């Protein structure tokens, strides 16, 4: 027997650790051909230079996606025998892991927009994200959607009015963003002042102000000084009425505006006044009017337009509507249950105030909210026990949705703070750019007007002085860019003030060729980097600009372009500021307006140029194209 055990024991041990099966048959041959076939199915995915290797069968598990279908062959490169994708390799790691494990995860450190773009490119839907990451993904996506909506609203109610905006759109923009104009800001503060005055008057008119002659009882201030309070209320209601009518007239959608909460508050705030004007002196009718006057207190909600904190609180309550609904439903159930229990528990007591189940509602509400007024208390032992349970259950029911509400309030508050910070940074950045460009353009136009550029071009010894006067590197490059635009195009830069004062006149003159130093042949910092084109020698007649106009240089914002028949003209730019001999009136009733923005100046490059230049065209007239915002 021992010999038999010794014969099969090694096989049992080998089978236990997975070396060989228990069967006594011969071991099968290794799958050499299958392994070779599997190695041939190993594919390489090159994602922006990062190589990933996986099996073809792994990708073909999901044939409805890009990598699992034959569409990936469009990205195959036979030279490298790789599939190349110009995408984000960091996010692609998580996408490839989905093919390997069948679970898609969301990397919390990645941008939600970039992640959605990668999923859409590879044909994956966000709904397959694992449960461990799906809630985080939904929260980040909701925050991003709210941020984009906030940015869109900011762009729509931006500080700069678009030229295509109608008067109605401008009025609505002024109401929604009062800081766009001075008048809108003044009206904003005036309405806020009258809201405060109306609320204070509504409170003060109930304060006793002493007894009047013939009355023993003290009269409230609203009755003793009825005329003064009526005039004050009339002034407030007139302001509120004008504001409501203007908002209604300027609203993009009047139907949506009328149905909005703030519109209903505005109507409720002013409606009691107009009802009181048409009321009779009948005491029964006036009693109903006194009841309506309580709605004047709703004017305090008009402060929500002037308070960011109130708006955030409103957004929080709106976003927590489901949690608040759950809280109300839970409290209602608990109130009904405990009121019924307390009624039957106290039914046997003669001194009990629990006369009915509706009467017990007051006790359960006060107890569950942990107020405890003490006007109704249980007398029996059973009533005290159930009252204690009611108090503890109220604490639990109310405390459950509170963290959710606080979390939503904190999220909305910080999101609003970030949006304000982004708007402030954007405003400061645009202000710095405008200041830099305006200063550079003003310096350029002033130097042209004073003839400094042409004086500097007369001798090469003065170039260091010109460089020292040019200011910062940004200003130097901006001057160089303006000079290149004047050289390569038939444009001349003039300021807005001179353009308006010139009465839209342009002069043409034929002069012989001159070899005098010109603006186009400047070397050094302002030397050209652009090929020479046919040039014009006309100008807006700004040589006669008075000293006062010279001192107040406007922002460079006008380019005059004349596209007419060409005739030989002098190729010299030395007479840039010379007076014209002939003036031609232009038909400017229908000017063409185009917008252009120059943001990247061209670096200076020194290019030697000779005196042999092609002749420049002569311009006898044509339409003027004003290119603004340069």
Swiss-Prot record:
Region entry Interaction with KCNIP1, KCNIP2, and other family members, spans: 2-20
Intramembrane segments: 358-369, 370-377
Impact when changing residue 607 to A: No effect on the regulation of neuronal A-type current in response to activation of metabotropic glutamate receptors
Modified residues (Phosphothreonine): 38, 602, 607
Extracellular topological domain residue ranges: 207-226, 282-287, 346-357, 378-380
InterPro entries, per database record: BTB/POZ_dom, Ion_trans_dom, K_chnl_volt-dep_Kv, K_chnl_volt-dep_Kv4, K_chnl_volt-dep_Kv4.2, K_chnl_volt-dep_Kv4_C, Shal-type_N, SKP1/BTB/POZ_sf
Entry PTM: Phosphorylation at Ser-438 in response to MAPK activation is increased in stimulated dendrites. Interaction with KCNIP2 and DPP6 propomtes phosphorylation by PKA at Ser-552. Phosphorylation at Ser-552 has no effect on interaction with KCNIP3, but is required for the regulation of channel activity by KCNIP3. Phosphorylation at Ser-552 leads to KCND2 internalization. Phosphorylated by MAPK in response to signaling via the metabotropic glutamate receptor GRM5. Phosphorylation at Ser-616 is required for the down-regulation of neuronal A-type currents in response to signaling via GRM5.
One matching Pfam family: DUF3399
Tissue localization of expression: Detected in hippocampus, thalamus, medial habenular nucleus, striatum, amygdala, brain cortex and cerebellum. Detected in hippocampus CA1 and CA3 layer, in stratum oriens, stratum radiatum and stratum lacunosum-moleculare and in dentate gyrus. Detected in dorsal horn neurons; colocalizes with GRM5. C-terminally phosphorylated forms are detected in the stratum radiatum and in basilar dendrites in stratum oriens in hippocampus CA1 and on cell bodies in hippocampus CA3 layers, with lower levels in stratum lacunosum-moleculare.
Listed GO MF terms: A-type (transient outward) potassium channel activity; metal ion binding; voltage-gated monoatomic ion channel activity involved in regulation of postsynaptic membrane potential; voltage-gated potassium channel activity
Residue numbers carrying Phosphoserine: 438, 548, 552, 572, 575, 616
Stretches the record annotates as Interaction with KCNIP1: 71-90
Effect listed in the UniProt record for changing residue 362 to F: Abolishes channel activity. Alters potassium channel kinetics in heart myocytes. Abolishes the fast component of I(to) in heart ventricle
GO cellular component labels: anchoring junction; caveola; dendrite; dendritic spine; GABA-ergic synapse; glutamatergic synapse; Kv4.2-KChIP2 channel complex; membrane
Chain sites annotated for binding Zn(2+): 105, 111, 132-133
Regions of this protein lying in the Cytoplasmic compartment: 1-184, 250-256, 308-321, 404-630
Membrane topology: Multi-pass membrane protein
Record keywords, A-Z: Cell junction, Cell membrane, Cell projection, Ion channel, Ion transport, Membrane, Metal-binding, Phosphoprotein, Postsynaptic cell membrane, Potassium, Potassium channel, Potassium transport, Synapse, Transmembrane, Transmembrane helix, Transport, Voltage-gated channel, Zinc
UniProt-annotated location(s): Cell membrane; Cell projection, Dendrite; Synapse; Perikaryon
Reaction(s) this enzyme catalyzes, per UniProt: K(+)(in) = K(+)(out)
Phenotype on disruption: Mice are viable, fertile and appear to be in good health. The loss of KCND2 has only minor functional consequences, probably due to an increase of the activity of other potassium channels, even though there is no visible change of their expression levels. Mutant mice show no sign of heart dysfunction, but the fast component of the rapidly inactivating and rapidly recovering potassium current I(to) is lost in their ventricular myocytes. Instead, a slowly inactivating current is expressed that is not observed in wild-type.
Family: Belongs to the potassium channel family. D (Shal) (TC 1.A.1.2) subfamily. Kv4.2/KCND2 sub-subfamily.
Protein role: Voltage-gated potassium channel that mediates transmembrane potassium transport in excitable membranes, primarily in the brain, but also in rodent heart. Mediates the major part of the dendritic A-type current I(SA) in brain neurons. This current is activated at membrane potentials that are below the threshold for action potentials.
Assembly mode: Homotetramer or heterotetramer with KCND3 or KCND1. Associates with the regulatory subunits KCNIP2, KCNIP3 and KCNIP4. Interacts with the regulatory subunit KCNIP1; this interaction mediates the capture of both the N- and C-terminus of KCND2, preventing N-type inactivation and stabilizing the S6 conformation, thereby accelerating closed state inactivation and recovery. In vivo, probably exists as heteromeric complex containing variable proportions of KCND1, KCND2, KCND3, KCNIP1, KCNIP2, KCNIP3, KCNIP4, DPP6 and DPP10.
Protein name: A-type voltage-gated potassium channel KCND2
Organism from which the protein derives: Mus musculus (Mouse)
